[in-house]
Amino acid sequence: MNSEGIKLSLVKMIKDKRGVSFVEIENFFDEIGFDYLGDEMINSGENKKIIYWCDWNEQACGVIIELVKDELVEMTPANPLIYIWLTGKV
């Protein structure tokens, strides 16, 4: 699946579920066989010290950043318990 197809599928998933976590996005990437792992991160455009997610490659970060810039999705803080529930990690 190309970047545009990934973006369309992500927007649909996010709208259908009324929001998703980065863990759920990674699970989606795994399901479609998209190689997202790397050394890049998504951080706040206003404060580079605020990191939203890391260990993705440039293409994966670009997909999310483009969706946010195009105002197709928005990033909002999630309850940390969601990540514990989804990953089983504390």
Question: How should these model regions be labeled?
Answer:
Residues 34, 72-73:
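Short aromatic/hydrophobic-glycine micro-motifs
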Residues 24-28, 67:
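A short acidic, leucine-rich amphipathic alpha-helix
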Residues 17, 70-71:
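Alpha-helix C-caps/helix-loop-beta hinges
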Residues 31-58:
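Short, positively charged loop/turn segments that connect secondary-structure elements
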